[in-house]
Amino acid sequence: MLRATVVKLGANLCLLMALTAPTGKSHAQQRQTGWIADAQNGCRLWNPDPGPGESIKWDGPCVNGFGDGKGTLRWFTNGENDETDEGEFRRGKLNGIAIVTWNDGRRFEGQWRDHKPNGQGTLRTKDSQVYSGEWRNGCFQQDNRRATQNATDKECGFR
């Protein structure tokens, strides 16, 4: 009887530990897309890949609480500028012609729709690769060359 109780208690304890064990990321750390607001003017812009310590600075029109029109969006991580988006925005997302530069040397210049490259554009990577031509929903495929921007390989059908 005592032994059975210990086994049962042990099994319940193991179950309790399994249910409460850390899963690698806390709920607060899980990355989800969404909106981010400029702390100074409250204007919201789309954040396709949120990360800890991010903030933005929006220089452009704010219509109904969203960045809208020609403007410059600067992205910061822990106070350091790591991306600049210059161009046309509609309801907080890149829409139209824009130039996006990253501090690691990447640069995209071209057409955007709903915050993804869509239409003619050129991506220059940090290792001097150039992907120039037609982009569809953040996906580039030409001959045997493939690239993504604000899209995954799976979303682009590259798997």
Predicted regions and their residues:
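C-terminal segment of classical bacterial N-terminal signal peptides
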Residues: 17-25
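Glycine/tyrosine- and acidic-biased, solvent-exposed loop/turn segments at the edges of beta-strands
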Residues: 24-159
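Bacterial N-terminal signal peptides that target proteins for export
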Residues: 1-13
